[in-house]
């Protein structure tokens, strides 16, 4: 079933959605390669990639952001194909053994996984700052208040016992916020300022 651009299956597994969007993105990337074969300005490639390819790979990612290595690599493969092409057009030496994160940095891009994490955290920030109004989601945010001083300084209490629950949006983003110790930034910074802060934390 497809609802608002996201493919759902009865077991709430988003592998089908990821396969669909990667397939369509690779097709669009192939189209871009054909129509830009005489272009030389890397900025033009970035504009087309961001507008026609990457947006497909990030639409509603808060819902389907994968945790499995296979799905993460499947998505990153699209950007790797783009980087290989833009390296060739920019006369930058490309070889298969080059570090992917290093190549992303060379062209001022972040990995798709990093961008999905940023999108998750930005949505949580909007939720806590009441930019997004959702009583149900705000009710899922539980603060951890220990009865005595502990070494564990995590702010959010994450309720999840099964893997499917852990992979859903709220447990996933609260766990990430705990890991990065972002509570003060989440509740005290407005979205634009918070986005600048959190973007610097990811490759």
What residue ranges belong to the model's regions?
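Hydrophobic/basic alpha-helical segments
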Residues: 1-203
């Amino acid at each position: 079933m497809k609802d608002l651009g996201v493919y759902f299956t009865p077991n709430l597994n988003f592998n089908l959605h990821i396969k669909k969007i990667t397939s369509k993105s690779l097709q669009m990337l192939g189209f871009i390669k054909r129509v830009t074969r005489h272009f030389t300005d890397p900025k033009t490639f970035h504009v087309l990639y961001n507008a026609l390819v990457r947006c497909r790979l990030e639409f509603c990612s808060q819902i389907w952001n994968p945790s499995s290595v296979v799905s993460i690599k499947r998505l990153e493969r699209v950007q790797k194909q783009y980087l290989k092409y833009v390296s060739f057009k920019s006369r930058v030496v490309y070889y298969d053994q080059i570090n992917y994160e290093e190549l992303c940095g060379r062209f001022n891009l972040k990995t798709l996984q990093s961008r999905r994490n940023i999108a998750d955290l930005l949505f949580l920030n909007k939720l806590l700052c009441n930019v997004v109004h959702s009583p149900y989601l705000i009710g899922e945010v539980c603060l951890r208040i220990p009865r005595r001083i502990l070494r564990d300084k995590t702010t959010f209490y994450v309720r999840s016992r099964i893997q499917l629950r852990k992979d859903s949006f709220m447990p996933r983003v609260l766990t990430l916020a705990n890991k990065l110790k972002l509570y003060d930034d989440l509740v005290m910074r407005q979205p634009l300022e918070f986005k600048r802060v959190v973007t610097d934390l990811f490759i």
